[in-house]
Amino acid sequence: MAKADEGTDYIRVTLARLVPEHGQGRVVILKTYKDPKSYYMDGATLVFNRPLGIRRNKVVLPAGYELVGCTVASQVLMEKDGRIAISFMHAGAGEAPLILRAVKDAQVGAAALPHAATRDKSWESPFAGETERARLTERAYEDRDIVYFLQQPETHSFSLYHDYTERRAGVNGYANVVRDGSVASHPSAYVLDTGAQLKATEMSGAEMAASKINTGETVDPKARVVVIPFTAVKEGETLRLRIAETYTAPISYKLDGDELVFDRTLGRPRNAVVLPSGWYVTASAEPATVSLLPDGRVRLEYWDDRPEAADVLLKAKRRVEK
């Protein structure tokens, strides 16, 4: 082969027919690699550490393994036989720096099989079209961080904290509208800069308007909203807040047979979802990076660089008890 590296082995394929002018020759290549440097066990953890130069990739884990680490944002999918797979498109230059980690405590056999996908649409209506100004806002500059901590699915509840920077002079409150189908409880807030605790109160949109608290936005009078007042922001200053709440949302977070289902649009660029203890991810419609927390829970990071909301559909199964 011209320009070939003499120290490298190649597979040479003879095509069944000549490639026509302006045409293509399609080839399916099936091969098995053995490479201890890129695919190995690190204690009880399976590691696949292999940069991938192909633009579209899918990696299927062995039966019985759950995904606990993935460095490239990927869809998490389930094969028909219950094996976990990741799939991603790599649009950047060079190779995708993929490192997968997995541990052997996933279900096997009939218990591992996925539920059949339905024709049901998302319970949430699509978001209204964004304005040109919103679409051209620099999303990498947005510094909101939201972490969802899923409780056991039988409760339909999840807690979250939301870090937010207020920069608008004259604003003296934050409003968090409670979505239809959700109930908010245990709201709290404090100033990250000073540690000062803030009062959080749930009220209607009409009550918020009557309170004269300036949150910088208008809320439907009938909506339920958690309002957090604070000292008005002065010109040239900012205020960094951490807001925490617990939501109960039977429509978006539930147990479907033996599967956990979290179905919720996330509108901010940076979101994370932490599975409850004892569960492993089996499906994630939105690409996510995956990591394992010190306490054994799985965390999925959704960094959404697109102007529309991330339509997260996340599924999980219980780990095998050891």
Task: Describe these PLM feature segments.
Residues 1-322:
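Lumenal/extracellular ectodomains and adaptor appendage modules
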